[in-house]
Every structure is written in C-alpha cells, then in structure tokens.
C-alpha cells in the first residue's frame, strides 16, 4: 500500500476571533512591511521585475496582498490592462482595487483551477506565497497549466523558513507588530501560515519547472538556506512534466 500523501496539509480550525485577527493582521502586516523593512521588500519585488521575460504582455500575480508588488513595476498601458492580481482575502482585494484600479483584481483560491485558458500568462509572480499553501502541489500544477510554455516564467520569492536569521527577523518584526496590536501568543498565527519549508517548495516545483536563476538574500555569496532570509527563483516550464510519485 503506497504511503499516504502529506498534501493537502490539514490545519487546525480557527475560532471566530482567530479568523478576525488573522484577516486583520495580514492586512496590517502588508501595510507595515514596506515602510519598516525596505531592504527585504526591495529584494522581494525587484527580483521578479529583473527576471521577467522581455516583451511580456500578460501577468498573473498570485497572493497579491494589497498590490505592493505593483509599486515596483513599470508597465505599459497594455501590460497594466493585462495584469491579473489574484488574492484570496476579500479585505485585501479591496485594497488592490482602490490603489490600482487599472489592473484586474481576481478574488479566488490559487490552489483551485482559475478561469483562464492554458498558457495564457507570460509571467506568473508569487512573492512570499508558496510557503502558505496547504495544497501546494495543486497551486504549482495550476501555475504550470497557465504559464506560456515557450517563453513564460514563474517568478518566485520564498522565505528561508527555519533558518536562524529568519527566525530572529520574525521575532523582531512581525511578532513585535502582532503583540503590540493584539497581545497574547503569536505562535498560533505563524505556525499555520508558514507551513511549507524551502526544500518542500523546491521539491514540488521540480517536476514542472527548471531553475533558470536563483539568488539568496541578504548573503548571495553564502548560498544556503540557513544563512539567509529569502530565495528568489526564476523558473522555466518544462516541455512536459516529470513523473510525479
């Protein structure tokens, strides 16, 4: 009998109060991060811009938050019109519509099939998203379906979750912001948010994409998860997926 799959990961249910805090804090953190932690935000968003395919027309950004990434883009009117910002939380999507009315805001779960034809997107961007997804393989399969196969790119930034630098950074940043606003224990929040480690994300990407470019931050000359905060990946879709066990 084959071993049971770990996907999708099952998270403990939230109380109504935890759900309220979760939605509120996610928006608060997205509002706070650009103003207090500019260096890491610059890496998060400049990496996808620098590795975008030349002459791209269509973009899907999954987990777009409040649209922070759009501040780093220099889009033509056509590229802006064909930029689809996908967000799961309606309270976050409302912020995208307000700030960036010329892009297309799509409220949907990126772990489910999205209403676009195969190969529609020249770029798919996922900045600090893949670590959050209980059904990560389904999201990656959908990204593979949607990306244009001859010149499209999947542009990803993930945290070095579990590394000493990242653990310390969370302690002095997100945890501090959380406790100032809500008090109490923070661990229930982050342990159900950052549920996929870098090796898990890379393992699920491998059957569908090859790595064209990789960069660690802030120490690219020490390219190891345990010495860094984030990893940027420019990924090329395989002509055919590898067999998935």
Question: Where is each model-derived feature located?
Answer:
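S-adenosyl-L-methionine-dependent methyltransferase catalytic module, highlighting the catalytic core
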Residues: 5-17, 24-27, 31-35, 134-149, ...
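Conserved alpha-helix/loop element of class I SAM-dependent methyltransferases that forms part
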Residues: 38-56
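Conserved class I S-adenosyl-L-methionine
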Residues: 56-65
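Residues at the starts of beta-strands that form the adenosine-phosphate
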Residues: 58, 82, 153
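Class I SAM-dependent methyltransferase SAM/SAH-binding core
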Residues: 65-112
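A short acidic, Gly/Pro-enriched loop at the edge of an enzyme's catalytic core
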Residues: 111-123
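A short beta-strand submotif of the Rossmann-like class I SAM-dependent methyltransferase core
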Residues: 123-129
């Amino acid at each position: 009998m084959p071993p049971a799959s770990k996907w999708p990961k099952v998270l403990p249910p939230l109380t109504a109060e935890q759900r309220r805090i979760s939605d509120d804090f996610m928006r608060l953190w997205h509002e706070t991060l650009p103003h207090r932690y500019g260096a890491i935000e610059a890496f998060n968003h400049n990496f996808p811009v620098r590795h975008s395919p030349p002459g791209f027309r269509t973009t899907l950004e999954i987990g777009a938050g409040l649209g922070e990434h759009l501040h780093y883009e220099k889009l033509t009117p056509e590229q802006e019109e064909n930029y689809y910002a996908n967000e799961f939380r309606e309270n976050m999507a409302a912020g995208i519509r307000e700030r960036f009315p010329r892009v297309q805001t799509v409220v949907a779960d990126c772990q489910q099939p999205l209403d676009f034809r195969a190969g529609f997107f020249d770029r798919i961007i996922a900045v600090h998203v893949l670590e959050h997804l209980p059904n990560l393989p389904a999201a990656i399969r959908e990204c593979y379906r949607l990306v244009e196969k001859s010149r499209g790119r999947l542009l990803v930034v993930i945290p070095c979750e579990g590394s000493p630098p990242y653990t310390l950074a969370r302690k002095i940043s997100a945890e501090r912001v959380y406790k100032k606003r809500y008090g109490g224990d923070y661990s229930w929040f982050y342990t159900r948010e950052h549920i996929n480690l870098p090796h898990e994300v890379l393992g699920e990407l491998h059957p569908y994409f090859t790595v064209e470019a990789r960069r660690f931050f802030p120490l690219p000359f020490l390219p190891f998860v345990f010495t860094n905060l984030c990893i940027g990946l420019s990924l090329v879709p395989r002509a055919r997926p590898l067999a998935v066990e």
